[in-house]
């Protein structure tokens, strides 16, 4: 019987914490956790540990937080753990070849897409915006390129019409934990089979930018709706009404035709605020006024604020 794998885990946000929890539940020996340095957060701008660090401390696992691995001292510290494998999930720090080569069996990455589609930083949101019918988890052997390594295991989930960036993220986070537990079991039995990625099929999920969330009403309603879903909970789509920023949390799209200028409010009811788009009509069902919380259209009408009024033309550009 083979000896238990000594695992280093590297990750930072909630997505990674789900994978670490799955490994702990499966009784894997986590010899160290690597995570990004604590960041200022909250009203007091105090340094707060991320979800992965909090979980590691709860289980008394050694935590390392190098800024990067340019320092030989940091690279040697990692080697000193003598890990069999390093599991990486949304770590947020580029790993040089010296780190990738340090564990006996290299580094395995939990990536939230079906590679080679959506390599890069924001695969969940890009899949929703593109109208993909499915997403999933790829466990891959890491190499120097951006998400270019051999694929070791894949699991698939459909993307439903109701999915948002949050719901798909949470589902993939759970799937990622299940997939890495399975992958490590296969690794220990020498049963993992590597499949090279087809580079000509690769697409890139560029990092999200806040300005992307500004709604361009000249776009098709269906595309705007997918962006609203993808950018929930961040950065949240927004538009402007008389210079005031209105955040849009939920909406549906229809192919209804309108001759009105894109951005024109066509209907304002307790059910929805309907807006003309470049193609079709967007029905907004949840929005957020300046300084407030997300509300329904019924709350908008009852609130009596002179915003999102019938006939108003919402701004397309800044």
UniProtKB/Swiss-Prot annotation:
It holds the Pfam family Formyl_trans_C. Its EC number is 2.1.2.9. Disulfide bonds: none annotated. Keywords: Protein biosynthesis, Transferase. (6S)-5,6,7,8-tetrahydrofolate binds at residues 113-116. GO terms for molecular function: methionyl-tRNA formyltransferase activity. This is Methionyl-tRNA formyltransferase. It comes from Hahella chejuensis (strain KCTC 2396).
